[in-house]
Amino acid sequence: MSRRNAAEKRPVLPDPQFNSRLATMIVARLMKHGKKSTAQRILSDAFQLISQRSNGADPLEVFETAVRNATPLVEVRARRVGGATYQVPMEVRQERGTAMALRWLVNFSRTRNGRSMAQKLAGELIDAANEAGNTVRKREETHKMAEANKAFAHYRY
């Protein structure tokens, strides 16, 4: 184990455009090679597309619903016990769950078919808000794995 002190947790400031901390977090995950303004443009374009496609619904609410639907509650973690590796189900802290949901949303958006990243992100967010799409499937898969390995729950650490 490390002898150093744990790194100080920096507060996430709300996004200046949408006044949302989740927006700041997804911009950080969308960003490639430090190009933050490009990531912010992708997000704002995606939000415009969401409001067009969902008959003027608030895109920030759609986004927050999508993140809520994609956030896992349990996950499995590998634990080595006497030469055997067990997949131990563990509860996910809210912070980590949100981070996982955002990471999945961005990654599955990138693998989608579409013209621009904004269109792909908008599509994935709308699907996740409607409890469909790859991101929600990934969360369900994670929950199923945890359920299947419930027998090893007593190995929790």
UniProtKB/Swiss-Prot annotation:
One family name in Pfam for this protein: Ribosomal_S7
PROSITE patterns found in the cross-reference section: RIBOSOMAL_S7 (PS00052)
Subcellular location: Plastid, Organellar chromatophore
Gene Ontology terms for molecular function: rRNA binding; structural constituent of ribosome
Main location: plastid
Keywords: Organellar chromatophore, Plastid, Ribonucleoprotein, Ribosomal protein, RNA-binding, rRNA-binding
InterPro entries: Ribosomal_uS7 (IPR000235), Ribosomal_uS7_bac/org-type (IPR005717), Ribosomal_uS7_CS (IPR020606), Ribosomal_uS7_dom (IPR023798), Ribosomal_uS7_dom_sf (IPR036823)
GO BP term, pick one: translation
Gene3D superfamilies: Ribosomal protein S7 domain
Family: Belongs to the universal ribosomal protein uS7 family.
Oligomer status and interactors: Part of the 30S ribosomal subunit.
NCBIfam families named among the record's database cross-references: rpsG_bact
UniProt name for this protein: Small ribosomal subunit protein uS7c
Species: Paulinella chromatophora
Source organism phylogeny: Eukaryota, Sar, Rhizaria, Cercozoa, Imbricatea
